[in-house]
A protein has these predicted regions:
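C-terminal motif of bacterial Sec signal peptides marking the signal peptidase cleavage site
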Residues: 19-21
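Short coil/linker segments at helix-helix boundaries
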Residues: 159-179
Length: 437
């Protein structure tokens, strides 16, 4: 992703210009240094910079981290914090959203901002000079990001405007397209993008790979109950040999677990780079609301979610922070005890915890922790769901048991905690394989 980070500041120069020597008729001339959609995108580097602008929108904490749109809408999480803090998030958590809600506008606006940027890259590529293979890779990544945005839009809102080309201002009054048209566009974009390179053939983390494309395409097919097509898409991911379940579930959510063998698509964050911070505040939003913990306490996991785990499941301690858990404190050599202060559920989220030793020199609104958008475990479980729908239960159980085996072999001691208040001890058979009986 080095190239993407180094170019991101160039995107912001597209709205600026320099005026050279003055003359009487300079106002009637187009300044040669002005970048517009007409004179930009002339070569592969400029088209790549346009793609960077598309990726830049993924950093929005309101959309692609999807805890606001997905977690809070489920029984797995409560808004958290206190009722007077971010009341609009409480409306989401309790299904009281209104069209006038700021957050509804944020989601809608950010998704369509991605789509607009992708449309421009795709449309302007026709006039780009350079290696056609490189141009196609840029275009196909933009198509994936456009499909990803429409996937969230149609899943959240149903009928939405379908915009698949760059629009002029006078064209911006649009009707809502039927859901079927949106799904058709998503499928079309993803099928075009399946020719993208695999993980092994990209030399930059964060790129869209064929595995990421097939994973989202399989999820789309599953949503639409196209089970044969679902199986074909997920089989492409599994048979590629590019992904595997890492032995330690907790490792995935630590800094060293970023872009690991289980990561299918991951949104990259980076801080302290020459062009500025490209970090995230999602972790600050969700870490415990406590001075010693340094978070704001939103997105608290619920008792309902805890009850979904089987006794002794090691994943519990990598999902929940419990009252009484002890962590290393900000001052080296000291500790503090989490109280889950103002958590309406009595718990906090563990996956977003950042050790104090990794926060040194970082702005609390700009942490360099990636968003694990799609993991191989999710692919396997979605694949199993599709196989089950086609009465291929033996194959489905095999995939489910792969995930269960990894879970039961995960260490029961969290290396980033001093101690955990939750008792994981269990004398029965831990997470046994699912069988036909």
């Amino acid at each position: 992703m080095k190239k993407i980070y180094s170019r991101i500041s160039l995107y912001f120069t597209l709205a600026t210009f320099l005026i050279g020597a003055c003359s009487e008729d300079f106002l009637n001339r187009t300044p040669p240094s002005v970048f517009t959609e007409i004179n930009y995108f002339k070569n592969v580097d400029e088209l790549e910079t346009g793609l960077v602008a598309c990726f830049a929108m993924l950093r929005s904490g309101f959309v692609f981290d999807h805890w606001m749109t997905d977690d809070l809408n489920s029984d797995d999480a409560d808004c958290g914090s206190s009722p007077g803090d971010q009341p609009l998030l409480y409306d989401i958590s309790y299904s009281r959203m209104k069209p006038s809600s700021d957050y509804m506008w944020y989601f809608w606006s950010d998704y369509y901002s991605v789509i607009a940027r992708c449309n421009e890259v795709i449309d302007r590529s026709a006039g780009t000079k350079g290696d056609p293979v490189e141009i196609e890779k840029i275009v196909d990544q933009a198509k994936y990001l456009r499909a990803l945005s429409y996937y969230h839009l149609v899943s959240t809102y149903g009928d939405v405007p379908l915009v698949n080309r760059f629009l002029n201002p006078e064209e911006l009054k649009l009707r809502r397209a039927p859901v079927e048209e949106i799904w058709t566009q998503i499928e079309s974009d993803l099928k075009d993008a399946t020719i993208l390179p695999t993980v092994s053939n990209w030399n930059e983390s964060g790129r869209v790979t064929s595995g990421a494309v097939y994973s989202l395409l399989g999820k789309v097919y599953l949503t639409r109950k196209k089970y044969q097509l679902t199986n074909a898409a997920f089989q492409k991911v599994v048979s590629s040999g590019e992904y595997q379940l890492v032995p330690d579930y907790g490792f995935i959510f630590r800094h060293e677990g970023e872009n690991c063998a289980e990561s299918v698509f991951e949104i990259q964050h980076k801080t302290n780079i020459p062009d500025g911070n490209l970090g995230t505040y999602s972790e600050t939003f969700r870490m415990p609301r406590d001075y010693a913990a340094g978070g704001w306490g939103f997105d608290t996991p619920t008792k309902d979610l805890l009850n979904e785990f089987e006794p002794g499941d090691p994943r519990i301690i990598y999902t929940f922070i419990f009252p009484g858990d002890v962590f290393p404190a900000q001052k080296e050599g000291t500790t503090f005890t989490v109280e889950c202060f103002e958590s309406p559920t009595g718990y906090n989220a563990r996956k977003v915890w950042i050790p104090w030793s990794e926060r040194a020199g970082l702005n609390m609104l700009e942490y360099d922790y990636n968003c694990r958008y799609m993991r191989y475990a999710e692919v396997l479980l979605l694949y199993a769901e599709s196989l089950n729908e086609l009465n291929k239960q033996d194959s489905a159980r095999m995939l489910v048991n792969m995930v269960r085996a990894r879970a039961r072999n995960t260490p029961i001691t969290d290396p980033q905690r001093v101690s955990c208040a939750y008792d994981l001890s269990y004398t029965g058979e831990l997470l046994p394989d699912v069988t036909a009986s």
